[in-house]
């Protein structure tokens, strides 16, 4: 699937949601029903400390490696729509493209290491290595965890040196 120059043969559709926070996107992955849409909605509604947050796509995302970066874009048929449990599928402003800065993997809480190793905090997708955060699924603090991690990364930090003192609200 990889071509020379660090680009895939074309976009790959994957079951995920993506939100742009400031200048970088969060690719939210997880099993069906794990809370991807809920986390995306929470990040968009309360994006502090980021001044800007917008949906890229919900449920299905087109992902492509290009020049060592991972890019996400919406599937045309569902662009600008998000599923909000209890309300259904609703329209929402969206961005056409995001450079992914964090992989947020919704995971059962018991499967998340209490003290992650450095290798737990990085993952490779389509040949691009990225920071990875295991996020407890269906947890009310999930959005805060993602926002704090993204803020730390935006300031030039690495998840391996993340500190609670880094949190800015």
Mark where each language-model region is.
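Short acidic/polar mixed-charge low-complexity motifs
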Residues: 24-26, 78, 128
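Glycine-rich phosphate-binding P-loop
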Residues: 23-48
């Amino acid at each position: 699937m990889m071509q020379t120059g660090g680009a895939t043969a074309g976009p790959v559709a994957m079951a995920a949601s993506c939100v742009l926070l400031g200048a970088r996107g969060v690719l939210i992955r997880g099993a069906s029903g794990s809370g991807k849409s809920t986390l995306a909605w929470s990040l968009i509604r309360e994006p502090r400390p980021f001044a800007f947050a917008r949906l890229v796509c919900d449920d299905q995302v087109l992902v492509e490696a290009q020049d060592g970066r991972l890019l996400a874009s919406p599937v045309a048929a569902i662009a600008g729509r998000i599923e909000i449990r209890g309300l259904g599928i609703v329209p929402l402003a969206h961005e056409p493209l995001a450079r992914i800065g964090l992989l947020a993997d919704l995971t059962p809480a018991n499967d998340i290491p209490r003290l992650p190793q450095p290798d737990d905090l990085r993952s490779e997708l389509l040949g691009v290595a990225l920071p990875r955060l295991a996020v407890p699924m269906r947890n009310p603090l999930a959005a805060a965890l993602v926002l704090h991690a993204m803020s730390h990364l935006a300031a030039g930090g690495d998840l391996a040196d993340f500190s609670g003192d880094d949190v800015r609200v």
